[in-house]
Amino acid sequence: MRLLLGIPYGDSRYFDFDVRLLTLGGECAALEKVAELGLDEKEKFTKAEQMLVDLAYLSEQLDIIGIAQDKLTPQFLLDNLATDDYVLITQAIADLRKKHIDAGESQSKVEAE
């Protein structure tokens, strides 16, 4: 898949990406990132803080080809990911989830026959 505007990193801009479903391990890693940001104890978030929480989860589901996974921190994504590309990535994750759900439903129908 390809980003519209890309993510700047170093002296380049990166466009190719892959997404994956959030696993339990990924959720735990995202929660650790939220804690590292000092946001795990807060009850009310500013818009930027809420986006950092969302990006902690997104970072566990996203690979930008050419950028090391450990560089894709919530703060890095907040500072460098364009809104259009954020929407594109979240839609790709939603499509992947739907694909997996649909595959499970079609398998259930076959088994029921």
Summary of predicted features, one role per range:
Residues 1-113:
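Short, surface-exposed, charged amphipathic helix/loop patches that serve as local interaction elements
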